[in-house]
Amino acid sequence: MSTLVGVPVKNAEMWLKRFLEYLEQMKGVSRAVFYYALSPDETLKTLKEWAEEAPLTVEIYKDPPMQSVSSATIAPVYKELQEIMREGDETHFLSIDADIMKIPKTLIRSLKKQKKDVIAPYVWIEGQKPRTFYDPDVFRYKGLRFHQFDPPKLETTFEVDSVGTCWMATREAFTETEIDNPYPDRTFCNNARAKGLKVWADPRLSVYHLNTKPFGLHQIPLEALLGKPPDNTAYIRSDDTVVDIGTMPGQYIDAFVWGRVSK
């Protein structure tokens, strides 16, 4: 059972070599397909130099052009990856961002053996204290965002609404499910669930997302970029209690100023 790995990459020169080292060590990769978006640094040069010596099959494509602000995220890339997958013979697809670090060598095997339609490990921010979950905008459970400092902590794989950043899908789930903006990962999961497929998260498996703040890079909600009202979805904690959007700023202060997780 082979796995196609899809990687969107842009402005990643400063940390790309670290990611590529982890990718090389990951077992079960049959082919790695990169979609490169125009970058002012030497991301493309770094990627091409690595590809010449890489111990796996590597393909590099130019990112599809942006047609409008609403298409500014990576849905067009996913659509092209779906076509590449259809033309190949891989049984599974792994989507992973190029700023994911500390990837277990056996990640693909660990995800694949669970035989789920769509499944993801937990994604944490590298070196962040207190321990911080990376992307609650796409990781959702019971209609709520994962709490960043106290996400659901079930002891085994559990069914969720959506996942992102790093996830695996079977060939059928990936190629036969519509993907769209503004949150491609989330819309993919929602569309998959609408077709009767199931989406899962495994808290026993972890990868770490680069802490981009030291590089001066900050996540900006897509709603802000698109001029839409903010997403006021609340957060769910490990004990299933809910934290509303108005309470979260105080919890961020407790975490990052005082180093404690609010109860």
For each feature predicted by the language model, list its residue ranges:
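Cell-envelope/extracellular polymer assembly enzymes that use nucleotide-activated donors
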Residues: 2-4, 187
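Active-site beta-to-alpha loop of glycosyltransferases that engages the nucleotide-sugar donor
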Residues: 7-21, 38, 69
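Short, acidic, metal-binding catalytic loop of nucleotide-sugar glycosyltransferases
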Residues: 21-30
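A conserved acidic beta->alpha catalytic loop
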Residues: 35-47, 51, 64-66, 100
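Active-site nucleotide-sugar/metal-binding loop of Leloir-type enzymes
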Residues: 76-92
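Short beta-strand-to-loop acidic/aromatic patch adjacent to the donor-nucleotide binding site
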Residues: 90-101
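Conserved catalytic core of nucleotide-sugar-dependent glycosyltransferases
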Residues: 101-179
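C-terminal catalytic/acceptor-binding lobe
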Residues: 155-157, 161-166, 171-256
